[in-house]
């Protein structure tokens, strides 16, 4: 699977795929998702990650996209922002042959 260089924050995806086309605002969507308005606003504005709980709520509200979809999008976004040099000093740790087959 090819890695996207700069994947969008899943909150932006939520905004573009659902909120804007359906004419939903943050307040009414937060109520429908049973979550604080401030939390949804932070997600949509890329200031907060989509948690597993929120992903399940999004799946229920918008069944076209599964909770796994939202979590994969969040993981892809987070990984794209990792400093590639953060592990420069990390050395491989020898594991048992049994672990290599897993």
UniProtKB/Swiss-Prot annotation:
Residues 25-44 bind DNA. The keyword DNA-binding applies. Keywords: DNA-binding, Virulence. The keyword Nuclease does not apply. One of its GO terms (molecular function) is DNA binding. PANTHER family: ANTITOXIN HIGA-1. Belongs to the VapA/VapI family. CDD domains: HTH_XRE (cd00093). It comes from the Bacteria. Transmembrane segments: none annotated. This is Virulence-associated protein A. Residues 14-69 form the HTH cro/C1-type domain.
């Amino acid at each position: 699977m090819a890695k996207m260089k700069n994947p969008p924050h899943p909150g932006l995806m939520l905004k573009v795929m659902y909120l804007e086309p359906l004419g939903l605002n943050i307040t009414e969507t937060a109520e429908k998702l049973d979550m604080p308005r401030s939390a949804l606003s932070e997600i949509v504005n890329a200031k907060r990650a989509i948690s597993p709980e929120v992903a399940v709520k999004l799946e229920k509200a918008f069944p076209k996209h599964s909770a796994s979809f939202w979590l994969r999008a969040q993981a892809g976004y987070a990984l794209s922002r990792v400093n590639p040099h953060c592990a420069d000093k990390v050395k491989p740790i020898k594991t048992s042959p049994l672990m290599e087959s897993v």
